Amino acid sequence: MAAKIRRDDEVIVLTGKDKGKRGKVKNVLSASKVIVEGINLVKKHQKPVPALNQPGGIVEKEAAIQVSNLAIFNAATGKADRVGFRFEDGKKVRFFKSNSETIK
């Protein structure tokens, strides 16, 4: 099955502590998990590594979030949208279901 949410897509969070926030997909880990820029921030306790001259401390980083908790953001309507697939010139492309506009 083709991925409905891909890298560099702008998405909006539907549920959880970051509900309503928007961000860009940085990395797709699997079919069900992605990392979104500035969303689902967690604090990681990091030990110092003297060999690499790396200080220790508490570091904030993005954790993975389930794709089911996200929706693609349609800039034309300013809302979350659903994704469909169709063939254009022999190629499978994604489109927004609300206005049938092709996703770039």
Swiss-Prot record:
Q: Supply the CDD domains for this chain.
A: KOW_RPL26
Q: Which GO terms describe its biological process?
A: translation
Q: Supply the source organism for this entry.
A: Pectobacterium atrosepticum (strain SCRI 1043 / ATCC BAA-672) (Erwinia carotovora subsp. atroseptica)
- The yes or no answer to whether the keyword DNA repair is present is no
Q: Which PROSITE patterns match?
A: RIBOSOMAL_L24
Keyword Lipid metabolism present in the record's keywords: the answer is: no
Which keywords does UniProt give here?
Ribonucleoprotein, Ribosomal protein, RNA-binding, rRNA-binding
Q: Which family does it belong to?
A: Belongs to the universal ribosomal protein uL24 family.
The name on file for this protein is Large ribosomal subunit protein uL24
**PANTHER family named among the record's database cross-references:** MITOCHONDRIAL RIBOSOMAL PROTEIN L24
State how it assembles: Part of the 50S ribosomal subunit.
A single GO molecular function, which one?
structural constituent of ribosome
**What is the documented function of this protein?**
One of two assembly initiator proteins, it binds directly to the 5'-end of the 23S rRNA, where it nucleates assembly of the 50S subunit.
